[in-house]
Amino acid sequence: MEIVWIVLLLGAGVIIYNHMYRKKMYREIDRLEAWKIELMNRPVPDELAKVKQLNMTGETEQLFERWRQQWDEIVAVKLPNVEEQLFDTETFLDKYRYRQARKLIGQIEDGLRRLEEEVHQIIDEVNELIGSEEQSRTEIEELRAVHREAKKTLLAYRYTFGAAADLLDVRLTEAEKQFESFAKLTEAGNYLAARGVVQELKQELDSLATMMEEIPALLSECQTSLPAQLAELADGYREMEQSGYILDHLHIERTLAEKQEKIGQCLAMIGELRIEEAKQTVAELKEEIDTLYDLLEKEVLANQYVQTEMPRIGGMLTELAAEAKETSAEAMFVQQSYHLPPSDLEKYRSIEKQMHQLQKRFLLIEDRVAEAKTAYSLLREELEQLVGQIDMMKEEHEQFRLMLQALRKDELIAREKLDDMRKKLSESLRLVQKSRLPGLPEPYALELTEAKNSLQNVAARLEEKPLDMPAVDRALEEAKVSVERLYERTVEMIEQASLAERAIQYGNRYRRRYPAVHKGLEEAEFLFRHYDYEEALRQAVATIESVEPGAFDRVQKLWQADNEDEQ
């Protein structure tokens, strides 16, 4: 019974699905049918009727016939074929041949899409033809006005265009032929070709208008402004030469002739209507002329610099020489008291050598200024280099002088350090005396002797003449290590001795009961009396810990408490 119900449910499901699927497919057929009807009702005939208002000859007639044939084929052949395919689709559905129906629907949709594109193309091309005719008719009248205005300007102001006027006249005359060509193409119905003529004519007249606007200014530059600047440069050059300036290195006369030739080339470019080249050439000429002005101005400024700075630089050298002489005397005095490393002496000899070279170089420059055979700009460069070297040498000299002063300062610092280390050594001895130790271990006594000797070595170094500060510094470093190590060893030794003594006293309570403790403490006392405090502490701790674990911690706490009370 359950199987029967399952079969019935599956059958019902299949029937429902089949019904819904067929309904969906019929909706697709209805959509495609509506699309087909919408294409058939497109206003293509109305658009084609607009074309008939134009001259139906030549290119227009050919285009009209092509569009008409395309539309007739769509209406009479292609759309009826779509209708037949839709009918076949319905037949497949009625026979439940869903796969064939679905495939055919896809083909119909692709076909309608292609027809849609074809219809759009026809309408767009028609609109382009009609629009181009209307736009061309409007623009050609505007271009006629532009052309008339250009001819009037050329006629009225022909003199402002120089040699370019004839070629401008030729170009404007050729433009008139373009108007005639446009009229013939329009009359023949070749509206698209006529549109191309309009665009070419517009580009040509725009170009001519731009040229006619720029040529007068360019001619003014080449015929008036630039030649005037070259003449001014030539006059300025001659005046400066008469005033004693050396300008041979600038080659001004040859450069001015080259600029004059370049102006002639620019005028030729304008006459040939090579306006962009002419504009670039004028810009280059302006930049080159500005450079010439800058070069002459540079010589004037260099002359002012040389005249004003020469005395100041001479004073700088004199002052530096006097300072170097004082430093030389100071260095000789310092050498009697301090040992100067070879590198420092070599540095000072280098300063003296550079000083002589700078003085010699300055005298040579003075001679060249007096001879008046060298350009001021070159003299200025040399003086500026000289000033830079003087500044560098002043810095080196100052560093050397500060080094000499630092030697005495370093000596005082070294003596202060020696005093500090002596105090630290005395503090170590005071701690030993205060601790009332029975004696000093031999290693400690050796360290004490070593520390004293290191301090004596520093003192001896400080008394040497000349004083060798690097050697003093090395001796100071050795003494510092020795004294600090002794101080640390002193504190450690006193602590060990005090703890050993406390541990022995603490362990005395176990002497009678534990023979081993008695023996161990006797060994610790023996070591203590023989100044081996470290080993005595170790022996005492091991002994008391054997009978009372943790005893040493209590001894340490008692010892620390006593120390705090004493402080």
Curated annotation (Swiss-Prot):
Q: Which residues form a coiled coil?
A: 97-158, 268-304, 346-497
What biological-process terms (Gene Ontology) are attached?
A: division septum assembly; septin ring assembly
Topology: which residues are Extracellular? 1-2
Q: InterPro entries under this entry?
A: EzrA
Chief location category: membrane
Can you tell me which family this protein belongs to?
Belongs to the EzrA family.
Protein name according to UniProt: Septation ring formation regulator EzrA
Q: What does this protein do?
A: Negative regulator of FtsZ ring formation; modulates the frequency and position of FtsZ ring formation. Inhibits FtsZ ring formation at polar sites. Interacts either with FtsZ or with one of its binding partners to promote depolymerization.
Localization of this protein: Cell membrane
The UniProt entry lists membrane topology as:
Single-pass membrane protein
Respond yes or no to whether keyword Repeat is given for this record. Answer: no
Q: Quote the cellular component terms of the Gene Ontology held in the record.
A: plasma membrane; septin ring
What gene is it encoded by?
ezrA
- The species is Geobacillus thermodenitrificans (strain NG80-2)
